[in-house]
């Protein structure tokens, strides 16, 4: 079992109490699984940006077009992003468009590497649809999906 900081747990639990899914996601999960202390925590949720803003008292619409709202939890900024899929990357960095989805697996499938495509909350545990934990144990860096497409995007 992984232990999330109380301010991160608060954001996740608040979203859950309001009927939404929410997970710590990406590098923070990878770092915790490897015994490192994460420097920042990102949250992914099926709540839409306007729902996140409605639920939390202090927010900043940092990347609203891409579904990202920064929730200020006890003075700590926590990037909270709606589950999404992404359109084409014409500049190799940012997608031309994003579409919000209601499925965690679909959101995780857009991520670069399996070790970054894991999500965690204390209620549901680790969500690892692409064998990221196994890849960490084997010290393998593997792309999610088509490697050429992933490297073209990044």
Language-model-detected regions and their locations in the chain:
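Catalytic cores of the polymerase beta-like nucleotidyltransferase superfamily
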Residues: 1-153
């Amino acid at each position: 079992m992984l232990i999330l900081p109380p301010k991160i747990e608060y954001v996740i639990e608040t979203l859950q109490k309001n009927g939404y899914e929410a997970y710590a996601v990406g590098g923070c999960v990878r770092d915790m699984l490897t015994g490192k202390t994460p420097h920042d925590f990102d949250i992914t949720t099926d709540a839409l940006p306007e729902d996140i803003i409605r639920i939390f008292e202090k927010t900043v619409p940092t990347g609203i077009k891409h579904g990202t709202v920064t929730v200020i939890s006890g003075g700590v900024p926590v990037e909270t992003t709606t589950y999404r899929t992404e359109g084409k990357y014409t500049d190799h960095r940012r997608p031309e468009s994003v579409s919000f989805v209601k499925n965690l697996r679909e959101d995780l499938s857009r991520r670069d590497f399996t070790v970054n495509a894991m999500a965690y909350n204390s209620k549901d545990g680790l969500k690892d649809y692409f064998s990221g934990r196994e890849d960490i144990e084997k010290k393998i860096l593997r792309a999610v999906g088509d490697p050429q497409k992933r490297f073209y995007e990044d």
